Amino acid sequence: MKSAEIREAFLRFFEEQGHTRVASSSLIPNNDPTLLFTNAGMNQFKDCFLGAEKRAYTRAVSSQKCVRAGGKHNDLENVGYTARHHTFFEMLGNFSFGDYFKRDAITFAWTFLTSDKWLNLPKEKLWVTVYASDDEAYDIWTKEVGVPAERMVRIGDNKGAPYASDNFWTMGDTGPCGPCTEIFYDHGADIWGGPPGSPEEDGDRYIEIWNNVFMQFNRTADGVLHPLPAPSVDTGMGLERISAVMQHVHSNYEIDLFQNLLSAAAKAIGCSNDGQASLKVVADHIRSCGFLIADGVLPSNEGRGYVLRRIIRRACRHGNKLGAKGSFFYQIVAALAAEMGEAFPELKSQQAHIERVLKAEEEQFAKTLEQGLRILEQDLAQLKGDVVPGDVVFKLYDTYGFPMDLTADIARERELTIDEAGFEREMDAQRERARSASAFGMDYNSLVKVDTATDFVGYNATEGQGKVIALYKDGQSVDQLGEGEQGVVVLDRTPFYAESGGQVGDTGYLQSGAVRFDVQDTTKTGGAFLHHGVVASGALVIGSPVEAKVDADVQHATSLNHSATHLLHEALRQVLGEHVQQKGSLVDSQRLRFDFSHFEAVTPAQIKALEDIVNREVRKNTPVETEITDIETAKRKGAMALFGEKYGDTVRVLSMGGDFSVELCGGIHAKRTGDISLFKIISEGGVASGVRRIEAVTGAAALAYLNAAEEQVKEAAQLIKGNRDNLIDKLSAVLERNRQLEKQLEQLQAKAASAAGDDLSSAAVEVKGAKVLAARLDGQDGKALLALVDQLKNKLGHAVILLGSEHEGKVVLVAGVTKDLSSQLKAGDLMKQAAAAVGGKGGGRPDMAQGGGVDVAALDQALALAVPFAEQGL
């Protein structure tokens, strides 16, 4: 059976047993901040097991995509070198949430594995383990299923503590836990290894293929196990492992799925497919990289993005080792999509995006890979001992982009290890330098601790009545704020919107008789709204009733920009692809700023398309609608939730243009899209690896921007004696004339330099048989000096030359040494001395070097270094 057939058979079998087929969740866990990546089938059902979530079904089956590369579960260093380690794998699983328990779970597993209708595995090839004291499971296996006692193994607490066992699963020190039973396949006597529980169990003969976890207890802090009222079942069977069994091969890399990827990798690299470890690395890594990018991860220098970057660069290095010329890794995506795209459609729908991301990252790394490898080889050649020093590992990481595990990989191939502790010390030192160089701001919200909550009434009003329930000055609770004092006011109810979701907090004022408090910002801590500002008149005391008035004009302008970000978000997904995710935003009354995931600059044509889409929705003038509902209903309606945001039981769904944009949002918005009037993008750029930023304006600000641009066009036209109709033609003519004049100037400078060369050659002095020339030629740029040094080397024949110039307020230096002297005297060394003398830097080849500096007054002193330099070296 092919891997795809096994996957489908598993899902279909459990559907016939009353299970609901549930799609694989994203590799980015959305309900567990403790996880870097989804690494087990049960991750998406965690809240079901904990009783925090109720679903419409109590039996589920899935084929879950998983990644283990980074954090606690890190298989990266072993991938490619063993038969069963992978960065990406599929976990087949069936689950019961308080429905069936041990008897059914065991029967289901045995039936699927051994029935001639399903996998039809030989029963005599299967071994079973149970927790030592789990007599119930043991009896089901032996008395009901019929597994002989000689193929049953009881596993006790083999990890040094009560319930610390390979056959006892825990979610943590406390909480749900229970015994598990595992099914092993015997690959045969020709492979070394012993049954589970034996001294030889680490061999490859007996391989675990299916684990059934029985969650039947709740462990309390005192270590006591209490029976759960509704026991559950969590099972997992690796698709790659069971495929190897069904296809009668021992290594996962020999199954059909990997054979196709290995062939594609060999073709892309241009090498043979002979089972090399490096080829296995590439074939494995294309799966994890492809799926991670499809799920929204982009290469970066932190978090999930850095793990992805490490995997990509490891694959590139192994491809380079196999002789790859140019970019190759992205070429394997098509084979991955063909192999797994039916089961995981995101691979096909995002194939082009995955290819672009991989190619861009590969090309970026190629710029430093060869140089970094050369530096590493030089360091290894001088290595004494078998440990690569931590400072070398750090240099490769910091300068050439080599992740630590990539250097460890290379060291391993040479039977060396790396000094991880030394590397971490270097990293700590770098982090400390970064901390020392940064300026810290104080989070005023963290200083204010408020137990009460504020009732927000600002969705439909910009003013209202409230009562002062707390006052703060310098983070301390006070009874009153006097005139001129800055502080924070907390009301029992307020129309002021608190900064959230990228939208800035409202401004305005609070009035209580003759007392006025000017609100300069509004933030939130817990459920309390904090009105930051200053007392303009009188004294504000706790208990005072106030009239709260928001600056409605500012809020309205802000709301237009906020609504525009929603339209822009959807437009970005339409123009750039569904991989686009919001990474941050800032919305105020003047403009909007929107950060999003994307791997390359947005082109001018794409900018125009974005503006066209948003302005089309603006012109439709459709109502902006809100609805309060539960999170699951919102998701079913297609509402987009921002990754990493915390949502309560009820959420606010904001719809614009019908179903054009549907997002969860608690902000203040326009009433209709037409209120935005006009949308104009004013800038686009990168803010971090894999993150782009667009800034835009709307309404009156957009009109003002366009009017200013129109004035600039008029002024430019006047400067070149044209008008807006012939501006481009006129400007092109001016630029062409400028190019011609620059060319003529270069020719004149070359003639002048040649004439100067004739004059300068006679000024050379002789030092130990060589000619040494140092001269100052103000007004000449570096290009002219380089040409002159070449000319002088030909004329002088056996010489050391140093030329300097004051050019545009700075020093330009060029040094040259004829080739017959370059083994004794190096132009780069002379340049370092001369450039340092003028407060700058320089370097180059042994025969030619360039540099410069800012200290024009020291230029003559720098030129005077040429003669002593020659005297010392000759």
Curated annotation (Swiss-Prot):
One of its GO terms (cellular component) is cytosol. One of its GO terms (molecular function) is aminoacyl-tRNA deacylase activity. GO terms for biological process: alanyl-tRNA aminoacylation; negative regulation of DNA-templated transcription. CDD domains: AlaRS_core. It comes from the Bacteria. Zn(2+) binds at H562, H566, C665, H669. Transmembrane segments: none annotated. It is an enzyme of class 6 (ligase). Its cofactor is Zn(2+). Its EC number is 6.1.1.7. The keyword Amino-acid biosynthesis does not apply. Keywords: Aminoacyl-tRNA synthetase, ATP-binding, Cytoplasm, Ligase, Metal-binding, Nucleotide-binding, Protein biosynthesis, RNA-binding, tRNA-binding, Zinc. Its main location: cytoplasm. InterPro entries: aa-tRNA-synth_II/BPL/LPL (IPR045864), Ala-tRNA-lgiase_IIc (IPR002318), Ala-tRNA-ligase_IIc_anticod-bd (IPR018162), Ala-tRNA-synth_IIc_core (IPR018165), Ala-tRNA-synth_IIc_N (IPR018164), Ala-tRNA_ligase (IPR050058), Ala_tRNA_ligase_euk/bac (IPR023033), DHHA1_dom (IPR003156). It catalyses: tRNA(Ala) + L-alanine + ATP = L-alanyl-tRNA(Ala) + AMP + diphosphate. The keyword Metal-binding applies. PANTHER family: ALANINE--TRNA LIGASE, CYTOPLASMIC, ALANYL-TRNA SYNTHETASE. Consists of three domains; the N-terminal catalytic domain, the editing domain and the C-terminal C-Ala domain. The editing domain removes incorrectly charged amino acids, while the C-Ala domain, along with tRNA(Ala), serves as a bridge to cooperatively bring together the editing and aminoacylation centers thus stimulating deacylation of misacylated tRNAs. Catalyzes the attachment of alanine to tRNA(Ala) in a two-step reaction: alanine is first activated by ATP to form Ala-AMP and then transferred to the acceptor end of tRNA(Ala). Also edits incorrectly charged Ser-tRNA(Ala) and Gly-tRNA(Ala) via its editing domain. Belongs to the class-II aminoacyl-tRNA synthetase family. NCBIfam families: alaS. This is Alanine--tRNA ligase.
